[in-house]
Amino acid sequence: PIPSRGLGDVYKRQTNYFAKRFAAKEAFLKAIGTGLSKGFKFNDITIINNSKGQPFIELEKKIQLFIKKKFKIKKYQIHLSISDEKKYSIAYVILNESLK
């Protein structure tokens, strides 16, 4: 038998997890000014956490090249913040040229 105790918490955590990642991907696409156009898909963007739990964005090569061409930069940084409160998730992305 599957224990029913705690399954609601597991579902809630999974829902929050995916909602925050969706918000982060949407915020990123807005930061580069495309939305889901230019042939980009949500699967082209991956949200991961580093060893300290800080979220960051990994991009497929085609999006990396698009950013460099559109903004006429060679290197860039993506800053990501994700948060949630009860039934709401929010994310914001700052994209800036890297001087390093």
For each predicted feature, which ranges?
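A short glycine/serine-rich beta->alpha loop
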Residues: 12-16, 79
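Single conserved hydrophobic/aromatic residue that forms the stacking wall/gate
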Residues: 1-11
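Glycine/charged-rich beta-loop-alpha catalytic/anionic-binding loops adjacent to active sites
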Residues: 8-9, 73-77
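Mid-chain, well-packed structural core segment of small domains
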Residues: 30-70
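A generic structural signal for short beta-strands and their flanking turns/coil linkers
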Residues: 25, 41-43, 76-78
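Hydrophobic (often cysteine-bearing) scaffold residues that line and stabilize catalytic clefts
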Residues: 15-20, 24
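C-terminal edge-of-domain segments
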Residues: 78-100
